[in-house]
Amino acid sequence: MPEKEKDPQDPLREILAMLEREIAERPPTIGVVGVSGVGKSSTINSLFRTSLATSGTVARTKEFEDVDLSVRFNAPLAADSSEKSSGPGESPVAPQTNAPTRVLLRVVDAPGLGEDLALDDRYLEQYLENLPRCDVVLWVMSARNRAIALDQMYLQKLSRFYDKIVFGINQVDLVEPMDWHTGYNIPSREQEANIKAISQDRLEHLASAIGRKPALLYYSSRYGYRLEHLFKALLDACPENRRWIYAGLKNFSHLDFIPAETQQKLVFRATRRLAQMLSKSDHR
C-alpha cells in the first residue's frame, strides 16, 4: 500500500501550536506605571477598550491588577519547502503570509506612586516584585504637571528597569490654551506648540535622570489622540529575546479594539484620515 502523502501544512500547524503554547505559558505583558493621578487606568481603558475604575479625585488602583485581553496574533511561518532556496549572495526566501490566531495579551495596572508617603514603601516593593515579569513598561506622566521631581526620585529606585521603560505624556488635551479641536481630534496650532515644548522639556529632564535619551511620546487618553503611536512604541521596546512574539502583534493597533460599526462612521474615517496625513507631514 503506497504511503499516505504528508500534508505540507502539518509542520506549519506544529510550529503554530508551539508558538501558542509558549505565549499561553508566558503571555506578552505590558506594565503601566507612574505617580498617582496621571491617568494610568484611563490610558489602559482607552488603549484596550477595558473598563477599569478611574477617578479624578482619589486613587483607585491599590494593588497591581492584571488585565487579560484576547488579541490577534500573526504567527511568522517558515517559507514553503517547495520554493527554491536562496543561493550564495541571493536574498533569503520571503516567509509565507502570517497565519492569524488569537492570543493573550496581559496589561498590568499599577498603583500610583506619591499618593501617600505611608504607602510608598509598600508600593515600591510591589513595583520591584511585578515589573520583572513585564516585557515593557509604560511610565505615564501628566502634561499638566511641570514638576517631575517625584518621577525622577522613583526612577532612581527603579533603575534596573530603564531598558524596558517607554515614557508617555498623557492629558495633552488640557495643555493651555485648552482649545482642542474636538471635531478633528487634534490640538490647535498654539496648543500643539506648547505640547511639543513640554515634551522637549520632559525629554531633557528624563535624559538627565536616567543617563540616556528616553523613548517618549505624548498622547490624550481622553480623546484617543496618538494612541496608535504609543502602542507601536511599546511594541518596539520589547526585549530582544521576546521580539518574535511582539513581531506578531506589529500589524495590530489600538484601532482593532474599536467596534467595526464605529470605524465605519464617516466622522471617524475622516478624523483617522486627517490624523494619518498630519502624521506623515510630521515626519517630512
Where are these regions (language model features)?
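Conserved protein kinase catalytic core
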Residues: 52, 115-116, 148, 176-177, ...
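Canonical P-loop GTPase G-domain recognition
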Residues: 173-248
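Switch II of P-loop NTPase G domains
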Residues: 79-137, 141-157
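P-loop NTP-binding site
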Residues: 219-222, 231-243, 249-284
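Conserved G1/Walker A P-loop phosphate-binding module
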Residues: 1-110
